[in-house]
């Protein structure tokens, strides 16, 4: 393994976190953590052993008993300290994230900040977790409900947002009174470990956040472990479908955000500069590795005249190392890069035109990086591979239609429904679009319509499995269960004998 001259993480082999202790795994199988800009191995990530995973989940269950009885005010105080520590360490976290994932430092800071916003929102848990009360539903009888934690929960995280996605999960779960067993992506485990380290410093008790590592074996363990009541997952469709099926079969709640094909609709009355810049930034930023990237542009009517200018602007963007002054970084793996290139090439053979071609881009100072340049593919039809599959690379697929109705029909026929945007100066068009389109997140003149944590990250159709969404009020609902109490404190109970009839609440006795 390559020795780093200026390490930003203290270990070469990533450790498990069990019972508040970072411990070396006894694994026999390890995954290389590779800097995608240089091709260098920067750490080894273990496939945690069955004994280690079982110890982690049993410890989580034991620790949660006391934590659930900790006052919500004291749990919130831990989160207040946690958000402070994240802010104080934000530059170091961004550097770790950039080294293992490849995105630019500015984008890494944005990744972290959007997760930090969720941490801040958990500091309202006293309000978010409130139940309901109705007095005198019947004579001397009150009914009230409150939310209780589930117990042990689990989070399975993707590679593309090493900070934001874990922070969507464990801060909400534990502030609601649960414990969480976290499994970061084996490609980018270092950011999660730093976030876990800061959580311990903030006062999260030992065992309330445990971290294990691995691939399929770790996923299967999480799906099968009887102590785990709920699973949160963000990632690709194949894995998400599998986790949802296996987890729910075992009686667990599962929320899974899956793939996407997000369309950006450009109306002829849109602000041209804003629309074109938004398309380029959303599709090319983060090397296109965002589940909310506007990877598909739909130009309506005369707006198609702007396509050459779109291509000209996109051609000026250059990939490079994230810790340099680059427009965007590398793909996460060579396999991901090769797949993106294949989808473009196959579509070109079917008649698509590659106006901006990033397939052969190189970065001379880092020849082993997973480089692909900005690409714009036009004359695309809905039957081409670059449209039917999520490229998840810095490529913008361009289609044209005659009317807004045509654009909406195209979007609604696509199996995915993660998000979409429209660029227009017409309130009538915007309102029609937001009402008729079938997507979880809708932007109006907004390129990446990811909602702030006062709301929830939603989705539609093949982009989601499970019916309760991430963070916000729905996130709290996912990690809690409702208990309803009906109490009768009649000052003078009457001896009317036993009755076999169903009591009629609301009828004064």
PLM feature segments, named:
Residues 40-130, 140:
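Glycine-rich loop-to-alpha-helix module at the N-terminal edge of alpha/beta enzyme cores
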Residues 42-48, 63-69, 155, 264-267, ...:
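Short, well-ordered beta-strand elements within core beta-sheets of diverse protein domains
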Residues 64, 68, 83-90, 94, ...:
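Structural signal for hydrophobic packing residues in well-ordered secondary-structure cores
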Residues 131-276, 325, 401, 466:
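Rossmann-like NAD(P) dinucleotide-binding subdomain of oxidoreductase/dehydrogenase enzymes
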